[in-house]
Every structure is written in C-alpha cells, then in structure tokens.
Amino acid sequence: MLVTIRPSPCGIGGVIAAPPSKSMAHRAVLCAALAVGRSHITHLEFSKDISATLSAAAQLCAAVDTGADDAAVQGLGHFLPLTAPVDCCESGSTLRFLIPIASLTGQPVTFTGRGRLMERPQSVYETLYREQNLRFEQSPAGLTVEGALTPGDYRLAGNVSSQFISGLLFALPLLPGDSQLHLIPPVESRSYIDMTRAVQAAFGVHSRWLDATTLLLPGGQQYHPCDYNVEGDYSQAAFPAVLGAVCGGVTITGLAPDTLQGDAAILDILRRCGAVFTREGDSVTFAKAHLHGVDIDLADCPDLGPVLMVLGLLCEGTTVIRNAERLRLKESDRIAAMEAELRACGGVLESDGGTITVHGCAERLHAPAAPLHGHNDHRVVMSLAVLAAAAGLPLTVDDAEAIQKSWPGFFADAAPLGVEVEDA
C-alpha cells in the first residue's frame, strides 16, 4: 500500500484520542483466558497483534466473543487439545507470553508467525527449557515446545526483552510450588514487568519484589475473572505528541496520569526538549515551542525510538539516543530503517551500536523523488507520517498497511489533526 502524507493547507491542530494500550490489552486477554469464568475487557483496538492474542486464547483455553471495542473472554479452566499450530502473526508479545503458558498444556505446542517473528531471538527461553530437559525446537517455519516447567529458581538477564520475564510471570504462579526470578543487572524495561504484575493482580494473581533484582512468585495461585478497562496507549500517543510539540494546537485524550506504562516517558522527554504542554485530567494539550536536542535513555522505553529520531531532526542542536540496541530486533532493524529513510529526506544522523546521534536540520529536509520504505514496520510508517506533517513535506511511503499491526485507525484518527493521507 503506497500513500502520500502531507499536512493540511489549514495547518496542524485538533483533538485525537490515544488508542487502547496494546501492551495492557495483551496482558488482560491472557489473564482472562487463564481464569475460570467470564471476564469483560473494554476499550480494545483489534489490531493484528491483539487479534493474534485473542485467537491464540480461543485456541488454547477460552471462548472469546468480540464486540466493536470490547471482548468477553470465558476462561474454560482447562486447556483444549490442539489440532493446528498457534499463529502469532507478527506479534512478539503473543509468542513470548505464550511459550511458558504452553508448558502448562500437557501437549506439544507449535507456534508459527510471519515477517521477522521467527527470526527474533528466543535464546532466553531456549536456555531455560534445555536446562530442564524440555523440548524447544526453533526454525524459520515455527517453534515447538513440549514439557512442563517446574517451580523453583530462574536466573535470566535483566537487560533482555521484558517479554521473557512477563511470560514466566504468567505461567509460574500456576505451578504447585513457589518460584523466584533472579534478574541479572541491569534490569531494563522494569515498567513493563510491573505492568504485567499489575494486570495479574487485577485478576487475582500476585507477586512481589524481594529486592531490586529478585521477584517472588508464590505457587498454587489461580486467575479470577474480572471486568477490565484498558488504558490509553502512551507509546502510540507519542506520535501525535511529537507532532503537537513541534506544531502546537494538538490535544491528546485518554492518557491516564498515574499509569505504569514506561512509554509515558515521552512527556518528560518532550518537556526536556522545551515542549510546552498542559494536562487536565487524562488530556494533554501542546502549544508550539522552540525545541532543542537532549540526551535520551531508551532502556525502559525502546518503542519510542523511531519517532524520537524524527524529533531529533526537528530540534535545534544534537539529540543523542542511548541504549537503543533492541531496536535492531523489532519488526525491522529500526535503527537502520530510520537512518535510511531520514537520510533520504536530508536528515543527518549516525549510529554506533546502540547509540544514535541525530543532528537538528529542519531547514534542509526535503521530500525525495522516490517513495520512502515503511520496512513492514508500523512504528517506522507512523514516524514518517509525523515527519511529513511536522516538517511540511509531502512524503510518499510504501508498506503503509503495516499500521494494522498496532493502530489500524491511525491515518483516520490523525486526519482531524490536519494530517492528509491519500493513495499514491
């Protein structure tokens, strides 16, 4: 899908609602599926990722009935016999959350996926499974696991994706004995770990930090059904937030002020860049401001990386983004992808491992003659849309359908802000 994105002749400004948090929705769906009884999850966006988790839940242990923006999940209290692989589409969260849960089913479980999903590293789980003499077979065609995890002590690196830690958090409390997760410092993305724990607590399963690097997971617990409302998503709100910080006149609604979402850091980052905004309840309104580059640590908020690279181009001075290594292992190599596309627009930036240096150069940005590549990556496409609107460039972008992965309504929702999108 090839589209051209440009700002409206009337300028940028308006109100946009943050879509439901994809991270929280994944967690709520799985907790509901593992419960015995009916849970009602409200404020859902049926992106490809969330649809993959809902389908997997229905295949494994739940009856799922979806509405326009909600889902009733009836946990069956037992696992169903599998007759086909579990298709995780391109969702890393779906796959990594479900691998430990699969160990509870008493049967071999094969996972399949699309895009780069089966190329993404799973060595954390592979090591744990091999240590317990369990089956773990990964190939480009799929991943098969078999055998039951045992309660006990688990040691794993704290600077890997928190999805591995969350996957163990889902499954281990259901085992008959206590378990401890010993995280080798540094512990990154702690906010995502605590988000998992908070959603679990809403469904009656509890864990606690014994110290800064050790989690106690009491065994013999049971998930209980509940009604759960999903918060607005700060990682997605980052796109209109950067647009608002540059252009002004943008209000984002649905952003809980007391959130556990690590990507809420976008507001602090923008404030440090000189952004001017006010908060009233769950709404944040931006005024136009002169922005300057800052030093940014992505360790706890890696999903912000692509749009922060765009922000850096539109700030005065230099922006340095550190601890961005994990961007190379997403739906695309996001560092390489964004470097290529931003340079095509006249951007000046370079990377060294996990450090990205972006030089403010708004005055030299231009629309290239050839289309930009979306790299089949939703965050790359949405970041390029922000660049087009904020810099006043008509940019043609391919792979625009990649937004279906996380925010299917992104282009339609951004239209009232003055972001025009047409088929190219």
Roles of regions detected by a PLM:
Residues M1-A424:
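Short, structured segments at the rim of ligand-binding sites
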